[in-house]
């Protein structure tokens, strides 16, 4: 009996040991399965991470571009860093320079007609590098897309109103950003317009708020001028007109909706051609009939006529001598500044001050316009105007 007990006991021990070994093997197998499962999951995770990295790279690639909406309402995708710029037929050279604080970097080409204007203003001295850029086109109707492509620009700036031109430019595959002039983006107020140009340049270069202080400084000048004009009685505010061009003895005046019309509105002058839409051809007799009290002459690039030409009656085909504006020597030429002053430009607040001061001299008798201009140029364009340059601005 004892022998059976010993045998049973031995068998029980063996069974227990076998069960233990089996458990160990099962644990080992389970561990191996878990490790394999974890390894598989790790591999799956790693494999799933791969496309995530690609997506990240895509985002980085997207970060290398910037999508903006221009004044034509088009969404434009631009490279993050812009190093080569072509400016087509839109007069933003001076605003571009002001945006860059007295310099004009990255411009590799622009319209030759714009260069002709720049050559007649102080802009050529502030940013002489502009004179080295290529001429991509010359006349308003010229367009040589092949020459533009050769310059390898990152972006082309163009007149947002000119849809036909955009169609040609955009086919180059080069991003095109439209800047509003007349007929786009609401009313053509020159002061508001140059501010809109500056803001769009902030979008283009990804520098939101860069020109905020500059624009605020301009607003301060504008407010001062507005307050002075407000002191002038309505009955003492004159009638006037802006002679925009004079082509082959045919006068073209600034009618309703033009930059010139908005300038006259700002200074409280009644435009004698306010019922004429846009820049309109009129005959000399119509001007005689309207007989404005003040005659403003447009400036470089548009009208090659000076105050002395008019006062001394030297203009072929136009006898100014019987006009009240001439008799009273109320004729003013906008030669001043870094651009044609009656179109949008960063001198806008100064233009406003000048127009108001010549129109209402009594209200501005203590206003130091020349000092204001000098300070403005030094602060915002990093340029010290000489007395000779100031005198030349007013030699009109």
Predicted segments, located by residue:
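Bacterial Sec-exported substrate-binding components of ABC uptake systems
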Residues: 4-8, 24-97, 209-242, 365-396
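Alpha-helical, coiled-coil/dimerization segments enriched in small aliphatic residues
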Residues: 252-279
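C-terminal motif of bacterial Sec signal peptides marking the signal peptidase cleavage site
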Residues: 19-23
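Proline-aspartate-enriched helix->loop->beta-strand connector
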Residues: 135-140, 144-158, 284-300
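Extracytoplasmic ligand-binding site segments that recognize negatively charged/polar headgroups
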Residues: 115-119, 162-167, 179-199, 232-259
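Structural recognition of the beta-strand scaffold that forms the well-ordered cores
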Residues: 84-88, 108-111, 155-159, 176-180, ...
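A short, structured surface patch at a secondary-structure boundary
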Residues: 88-89, 93-147, 155
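Structured C-terminal subdomain patch of bacterial secreted/periplasmic proteins
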Residues: 188-208, 212-216, 303-396
